[in-house]
């Protein structure tokens, strides 16, 4: 598909230093590169109501991956058992989540926090204001943007001290009531204009 693309839409935070030359190859083939200010979650998500006070035993949604995805090799880290102690867990594991997939984002928003191996779930959770501990070596431009924009994302990588990052995450849970989320750019409108569509809501 990349060889046939006339137009390519990437976010403004696209990091060409980690894309293996993909974007430059498309540009050299004559594709027109368009930039969207925002993350993909800003196109399909809406900020949701979330708990303002953390439960005495924090309610945490935990997302584990199967690990057979195209990007998973070298990125997925085991979630340390120590960070799962003292919480009420909702299992949201890939391929084993028992709830309604269409209500997944709403389910996440009703928790005090998220612990995830999935960069997608982590990004969507923090966009909704849910403090999230991402356990992964993944490097993505959108993760850097979420951090720099002030969303409640905590990243545990293989070279980090588990106890330090875990302590930061726990402290972040208790700042939820004073968390002032950044305004979202109007990514939905930008995307609608790009595809020549009109928003109906």
Please tell me what each predicted stretch does.
Residues 1-10, 108:
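A conserved, positively charged/aromatic
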Residues 33-37, 97-99, 152-162:
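Short acidic-hydrophobic, aromatic-tinged amphipathic segments that line or gate anion-handling sites
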């Amino acid at each position: 598909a990349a060889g046939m693309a006339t137009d390519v839409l990437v976010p403004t935070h696209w990091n060409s230093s980690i894309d293996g030359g993909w974007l430059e190859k498309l540009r050299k083939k004559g594709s027109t590169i368009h930039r969207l200010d925002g993350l993909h979650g800003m196109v399909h998500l809406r900020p949701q109501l979330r708990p303002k006070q953390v439960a005495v035993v924090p309610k945490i949604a935990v997302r584990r991956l199967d690990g057979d995805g195209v990007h998973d090799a070298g990125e997925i880290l085991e979630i340390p058992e120590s960070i799962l102690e003292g919480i009420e867990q909702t299992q949201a594991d890939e391929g084993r989540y028992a709830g309604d997939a269409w209500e997944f984002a709403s389910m996440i928003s009703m928790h005090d926090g998220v612990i995830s191996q999935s960069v997608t779930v982590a990004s969507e959770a923090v966009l909704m204001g849910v403090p999230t501990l991402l356990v992964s070596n993944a490097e993505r431009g959108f993760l850097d943007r979420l951090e720099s924009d002030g969303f409640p994302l905590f990243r545990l990588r293989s070279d980090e001290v588990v106890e330090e990052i875990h302590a930061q995450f726990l402290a972040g849970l208790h700042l939820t009531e004073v968390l002032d989320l950044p305004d979202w750019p109007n990514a939905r409108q930008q995307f609608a204009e790009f595809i020549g569509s009109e928003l109906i809501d």
